[in-house]
C-alpha cells in the first residue's frame, strides 16, 4: 500500500459504489451515452420545473463507465477520441442539458491532473474515477475582481495543511465524492487541492437559483479549516511550463453542451410545428406547410449543421494533437481558435433555435405544462459562462494580427 492510499483509505467515503462498467472503445462510450441520455430524458420536465436534482441520472453516468472515458489506457481508461467525447456530451445534453453539464468539470479536471500529477497521484485519482467515484469543481468565487481571482487559502499549521474559503458556481458538488478546490498557497502561487466531499469543515449548499440549468446544483461550497492531504496538492505552475491545449479541451465540452441544447430545441421545434395551427392568411392546411415557417426551419437546420461540423472539426484537430509528444504554441493557438469558432455557432444555434421554437409553435408553446422554454433558459444560462463576444475578438485578432489567444479554461 502506498502512502497516498494509506492516508486516504482512512478517510474514504462510507458510501458504496455499484458495479461500474468498463468502457473499452469509442463505440461503447457512444452507446453508454445514449443509454444515459434516454434515462435523463425521462422526467426531465418535472425535474426542471421542481428543481429536483438528477441523482439517479448522474449515478447512471458513473455506472455506465462514462466518467473515465478519457483516462489513458495505461491507467485502465479507454482514452476515447475527442470527437467521441464531444459526441457523448452532445448526446447527454440533448437528453438533459443539466446532466450534460454536471460531469463536464470532472472530465476537464482529470485532464489537469494528467498534466500536473505525479504517477502516484494519477494512479490514485484515476482508479477512484474508474471505480465510479465522482470529482467536482469547487467553482469560482463571488465578489472578486474576476473569475480567476482567489480568496480561498491553503495554510500550514503545525505541519498540517488547511483550506479556508468559499466557492460558488460549484457545479456537480452535490453529486461528488471528491472536490477540486483552487487556493492560494502560502508561497503565493495557485494550487489545486483534492479533498474528500465528506471531510470535516466542508459544507455544500444547493443555493443555485439560476433560471436555466436549474438542476446542476451550481451553488456554494464553504471551507472551514478543512484538513488537506499534502499528497493531493497540485501545483498549477506546472500548467504553464510547456504548451498545452487544456483550454481548448475544456471549451470543447462547453461547445458540445450548447450543441446538445440546440439539437433538443430543434427536435421540439419540428414536433411543435406539426401540432400547431396555421396562420389564417397562410391559406394552407397545416402549419408545417406555411412558406415562412419552412424558410425559418431551413435556416435553423443549416445553423445547427454548421455548429455540429465545426465542433467535429475542432475535436478532430485535438485528436491530431493527442498523437504528438509535444505541441507548439502555434498548434495550441490553432486549437483554441477552432474550438472558439465552433463555440460561436453553437451559441447562436442554441439561442436562436430555442427562441424560434416558441415563435413557430404559436401561443400554445408558451403554456407551462409543455415546458418548452427550458431550452432557451438552459441555453441562455450556459452560454453566459464564456461569452462569444470575446471568442469573436480572439478569432479576429488571430487571423488579422497573428495574435495568439490567452491560455486559460475560457479559450
Question: PLM features: residue spans?
Answer:
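Glycine-rich beta->alpha junctions and the first turn(s) of the following alpha-helix
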Residues: 210-305
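Short, Lys/Arg-enriched N-terminal segments with co-localized hydrophobic residues
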Residues: 1-8
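Glycine-rich phosphate/cofactor-binding loops in nucleotide/flavin-utilizing enzymes
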Residues: 361-411
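C-terminal helix-coil-helix/basic helical segment that borders enzyme active sites and/or dimer interfaces
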Residues: 45-48, 306-341, 358-361
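A short core secondary-structure module
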Residues: 169-204
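A glycine-biased, small/acidic residue-tolerant capping/turn segment at secondary-structure junctions
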Residues: 319-327, 351-376
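Glycine-rich flavin
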Residues: 53-63, 67-166, 171
